[in-house]
C-alpha cells in the first residue's frame, strides 16, 4: 500500500526549484534542511543516509517519517503536516523552537529538518530567529536568501509568522524569563 503524502510533502515547487544541498547554514551554527529520500522509515536498511553525527550536536525533526539521527546526536521529533497552524500546535512549536534556540545560544550546531527543507523546518528556524530578535519578515527573508527563494512558500506559515508570531514569541519568552523581558516584574 502506498502512503498518500500530499499533506506532508510540498506539491507546489518543481524538483528543479528544490535546494541542491540537503541543508544550508542560515547563521553560524544554525542549519535548516530536509531529509534524504532514502533516509525514511520505509526505506530498505541498506539505503539509509543518516545525519552525520560529527556535523550536528542536535537536530529538530519536523517530518514524522524521517529516520532518527545517528548515534551521539540529540534529537527532538515532532511531525506535523505541511498545511496550516492551529492553536493546539502553537505552544508545542514554541517549545521546540526554544529547545533549539537554547542549544544554538550555547554554541551547539543545530539542524532543523523536515522533508524538503522548505516549510516546516523554515517555520521552526524562523521562530528561533525571532527569539533571537529578528523581525518575522526579516527571518523569512534571511531563510530565503540562505536556503532558497522558495523556502517558506506555505503562505499559511508566512501569514502566521508575520501577523502573530512576534507576539506569541514575546509572550512565550516572557513566561520563561519574566525579569529579562520585563525588568519591573
Q: Residues of each region from the PLM?
A:
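Cysteine-based protein phosphatase catalytic domain of the PTP/DSP
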Residues: 9-110, 127-164, 169
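Short, basic/low-complexity N-terminal boundary segments at the transition from targeting/disordered tails
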Residues: 1-10
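Conserved G/P- and acidic residue-centered "switch" motifs that form tight phosphate/ATP-binding loops
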Residues: 117
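Hydrolases whose catalytic domains are alpha/beta-hydrolase-1, hotdog thioesterase
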Residues: 120, 124-128
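Short cysteine clusters
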Residues: 114
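C-terminal domain-closing interface element
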Residues: 167-185
Amino acid at each position: 500500500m502506498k502512503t498518500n503524502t500530499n499533506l506532508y510533502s510540498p506539491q507546489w515547487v518543481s524538483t528543479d526549484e528544490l535546494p541542491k544541498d540537503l541543508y544550508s547554514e542560515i547563521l553560524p551554527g544554525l542549519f535548516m534542511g530536509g531529509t534524504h529520500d532514502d533516509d525514511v522509515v520505509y526505506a530498505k536498511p541498506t539505503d539509509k543516509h543518516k545525519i552525520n553525527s560529527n556535523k550536528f550536536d542536535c537536530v529538530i525533526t519536523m517530518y514524522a517519517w524521517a529516520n532518527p539521527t545517528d548515534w551521539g546526536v540529540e534529537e527532538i521529533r515532532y511531525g506535523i503536516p505541511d498545511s496550516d497552524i492551529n492553536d493546539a500546535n502553537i505552544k508545542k512549536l514554541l517549545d521546540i523552537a526554544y529547545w533549539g534556540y537554547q542549544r544554538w545560544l550555547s554554541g551547539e550546531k543545530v539542524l532543523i529538518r523536515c522533508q524538503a527543507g522548505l516549510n516546516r523546518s523554515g517555520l521552526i528556524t524562523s521562530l528561533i530567529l525571532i527569539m533571537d530578535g529578528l523581525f518575522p519578515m526579516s527571518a523569512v527573508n534571511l531563510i530565503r536568501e540562505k536556503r532558497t527563494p522558495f523556502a517558506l512558500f506555505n503562505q499559511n506559515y508566512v501569514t502566521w509568522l508575520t501577523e502573530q508570531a512576534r507576539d506569541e514569541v514575546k509572550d512565550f519568552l516572557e513566561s520563561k524569563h519574566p525579569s529579562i523581558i520585563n525588568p519591573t516584574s
